[in-house]
């Protein structure tokens, strides 16, 4: 484990820890999970870019994300889950389009915006009764979610800056506002996830990504079989 030199904005707190998940995977997962349970911030590798994570149900942690990123609360935090089943506990009225899209693209670079359970004790920003949810295609982050539960995760950068594709890029932007950095090597994705809003009756693509938008729309409308869409995506991702 390495440490990032401390700076004044942590008021004398211990320097952040950098853990190599390639050489010591279990130690990295344990360090990340311990920090998250305590309300800390952790930078994790995902299948797109590096993400800045907090326990979704720890309000101190999610508040720290907004501060670290200098992010407006009008931009609510998305949540990462370990499975479609875990999503069912976070939302209401999951439409058939969501089932089809999850079958095609989960785990993977697709975020679904769905109606949130009103009784959830969390603070993800101004959600207006919705939640953005994704299941990442990254074993390290999925293992952390299995230990901690759903995570509030956004790109590991300050607002308006490029997303971090390496742990050094994340450190250069977020510094000692983070408790643990988990180094999983360079991220190949580069692009953020495709975001589809399913709260308006019809599927609406809010943000494009690496997924083919025509295929995403066709799956949502039931015009393209999810397995065919998954095969097309796998072929495209391999090239």
Residue ranges and their predicted role:
Residues 1-239:
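Active-site-adjacent structural elements in enzyme catalytic cores
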């Amino acid at each position: 484990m390495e440490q990032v030199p401390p700076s004044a904005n942590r008021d004398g707190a211990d320097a952040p820890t950098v853990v190599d998940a390639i050489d010591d995977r279990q130690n990295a997962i344990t360090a990340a999970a311990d920090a998250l349970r305590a309300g800390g911030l952790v930078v994790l590798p995902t299948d797109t870019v590096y993400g800045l994570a907090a326990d979704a149900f720890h309000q101190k942690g999610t508040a720290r994300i907004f501060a670290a990123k200098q992010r407006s609360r009008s931009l609510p935090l998305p949540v990462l889950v370990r499975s479609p089943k875990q999503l069912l506990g976070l939302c209401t009225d999951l439409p058939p389009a969501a089932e089809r899209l999850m079958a095609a693209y989960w785990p993977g670079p697709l975020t679904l915006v769905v109606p949130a359970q009103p009784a959830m004790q969390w603070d993800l920003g101004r959600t207006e009764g919705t939640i953005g949810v994704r299941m990442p295609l990254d074993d390290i982050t999925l293992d952390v979610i299995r230990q901690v539960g759903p995570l509030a995760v956004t790109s590991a950068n300050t607002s308006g800056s490029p997303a971090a594709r390496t742990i050094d890029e994340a450190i250069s932007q977020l510094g000692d506002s983070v408790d643990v950095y988990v180094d999983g090597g360079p991220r190949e994705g580069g692009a953020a996830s495709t975001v589809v809003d399913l709260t308006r009756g019809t599927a609406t693509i809010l943000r494009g990504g690496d997924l083919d938008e025509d295929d995403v729309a066709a799956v949502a409308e039931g015009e393209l079989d999810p397995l065919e869409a998954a095969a097309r995506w796998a072929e495209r991702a391999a090239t």
